[in-house]
Each structure stands twice: as structure tokens, then as C-alpha cells.
Amino acid sequence: MAEGKGRVCVTGGTGFLGSWIIKSLLENGYSVNTTIRADPERKRDVSFLTNLPGASEKLHFFNADLSNPDSFAAAIEGCVGIFHTASPIDFAVSEPEEIVTKRTVDGALGILKACVNSKTVKRFIYTSSGSAVSFNGKDKDVLDESDWSDVDLLRSVKPFGWNYAVSKTLAEKAVLEFGEQNGIDVVTLILPFIVGRFVCPKLPDSIEKALVLVLGKKEQIGVTRFHMVHVDDVARAHIYLLENSVPGGRYNCSPFIVPIEEMSQLLSAKYPEYQILTVDELKEIKGARLPDLNTKKLVDAGFDFKYTIEDMFDDAIQCCKEKGYL
């Protein structure tokens, strides 16, 4: 069977980002292996993936779990690129941080070892998070790829999502170090809130948080400025980093930072049918003020962001309407 641009693997394919990357890869002529957790009773509905254009010929599913990194070997065999988007998310801290971190780090390293053994993988692209950059205690207005979150500070202060931030920080450091030591090309893409359309049936957490003013969930506002990127730009950036001979290492992918007051004005003007919290009502909110994330390195590497702030909100709101969340 002809494989067009080649075969790639996307871990975490049923997630918000993973499913959109799969959609984009299929549209770009790739054959795609994706991993999902075992479902012996076949209760999981993956029709949102199998119904994608081209999926019947070019999308293949493999059972794998981060708790057993060796389980990814079959999915990686014969692939030229790996997009590792799967990551445990436990904002409720239902498990000890050490367990979540070990699963995240060991899972990523196990997948990398399978990449080395495959002899075919040319580049491993790890989906990281702005939380691996922003929590460092530095008094800086702008952060870049040289900045890392301070794990000791996170474990001491325990801000919202601290366990996730620790796991992503240590996993990103581990995959970059593994790449250097084992001669495999590793790129990490550092993401903020991802906003836009979605093909997965569940309302993605990042969209729920980005639309907090539309959904009327004032109590969930934890920051006063939102780093944002359109999901399609994220998928495009992942594919760009696979297809182009840019240097390995870290890349920030956060083109916009939107103050919550600006968000209120934009949404209330365009969507008067929703009871958007006003600027005056937002003055009492004392959330964290995150620094900017500089995306110059990614842009200098030749990547162009396609979508505006308005595009992100328009696409997310329209999709939420279509799926019954609004």
C-alpha cells in the first residue's frame, strides 16, 4: 500500500490535540498509527477518528499505555516521525505527584527507546507545556526557550496544576537529554491554552478554560492573562517541525497573550447573546499574571501562524454550539 509522505505515530490520539493532529496528517497525505489505551469491553467510541477523511485507508490503532512503555513498540515500527502528545493530566491531584511524574517521564523515555530500536524514526516531537517554562520565580516580562520552571518551587508553593507542571518539566528535560545522549533528533513544542475547533466528543479542558467568560464560570478564572494558540496552528507547527530541517531543541508556540479585560470586550461585542462578565466585574479577580512566551525562535525557523485571536474564539464557540456545549 502506498504511504504517501510516510508513516508516523501519534500517541494520545483520542485527545483534543492528538485527534486534530491526526486529522491534519491524514489531510497532508500521511499514514498514521495512533495509540489508545486497551478497551477490552469495546466501550470507547472512536468513530470521531475512524470517520475522518482518509482514515479507513491510512489510520491504524494500537493499544498502548504509558504505564507500560514497551507497549508502544508495535505502533512505532516503520514510522519516520513520532508525535508524543499523550500525557497524564491530574489537576485534581488524585494521585501522588511522584507517581504521575514517573509515569510521564518513564513513558516518554520508553517511547524514545522504541524509536531508537525502530531504526526508521527520524524525529521525535514532544508536546510540552507553557507550565514547563512559566513557574520559575523570575521577575521577567518575557520568557524564552532558555527558561525552565523551577520544580522545587512548584513542589513548595503548589499552585493550581503544579503536579502537571512538574511532570511536564521533568519529562521535557528527560527527552531532550535522551536525544543528545543517544543521537536521536528530539524537538519539543511548548504550548499554551489551545483554542479552536475540536473533533473529539468531550469538551477539551483548555477550551473550557479559554471560554470561561462565555460559560459563566467565574470561579474557574485562575489567571488574568491567557496565553493562546489555535489548535490548527499547533497541528501545523508539529508537522512543520517534522518536515523541515530546523534545529532540534525547544520551541515556544504561543503567539498571543490576551488580558482577561480584552477578552471580555472582544466577546461581549461579538457575542451579545451571552452574559459575558464585564471589565468592572473582572476587577476583583486576583489571578496569576503570567509573563509572555517569546515565539521568535519558531517564527525565525520559518513557521507562520495563520490564525487570529478572533479566529480562535469564533471557531471554538461555533464548535461548542454544534456539539451542544453552548
Curated annotation (Swiss-Prot):
The keyword Ligase does not apply. It comes from the Eukaryota. Optimum temperature is 30 degrees Celsius. Optimum pH is 6.0. It is an enzyme of class 1 (oxidoreductase). It comes from Medicago sativa. It catalyses: a (3R,4R)-4,2'-dihydroxyisoflavan + NADP(+) = a (3R)-2'-hydroxyisoflavanone + NADPH + H(+). Keywords: Flavonoid biosynthesis, NADP, Oxidoreductase, Plant defense. Monomer. Inhibited by vestitone concentrations above 50 uM. InterPro entries: Epimerase_deHydtase, NAD(P)-bd_dom_sf, NAD(P)_dehydrat-like. Detected in roots, and at lower levels in root nodules. Not detected in petioles, leaf and stem. The keyword Protease does not apply. GO terms for molecular function: (3R)-2'-hydroxyisoflavanone reductase activity. NADP(+) binds at residues 12-18, 37, 164. This is Vestitone reductase. PANTHER family: DIHYDROFLAVONOL 4-REDUCTASE-LIKE PROTEIN, NAD DEPENDENT EPIMERASE/DEHYDRATASE. Induction: Transiently up-regulated by fungal elicitors, peaking 6 hours after elicitor treatment. GO terms for biological process: defense response; flavonoid biosynthetic process. Belongs to the NAD(P)-dependent epimerase/dehydratase family. Dihydroflavonol-4-reductase subfamily. Stereospecific enzyme that catalyzes the NADPH-dependent reduction of (3R)-vestitone to (3R,4R)-4'-methoxyisoflavan-2',4,7-triol (DMI). Has no activity with (3S)-vestitone. Catalyzes the penultimate step in the biosynthesis of the phytoalexin medicarpin, and thereby contributes to plant defense reactions. Its EC number is 1.1.1.348. Disulfide bonds: none annotated.
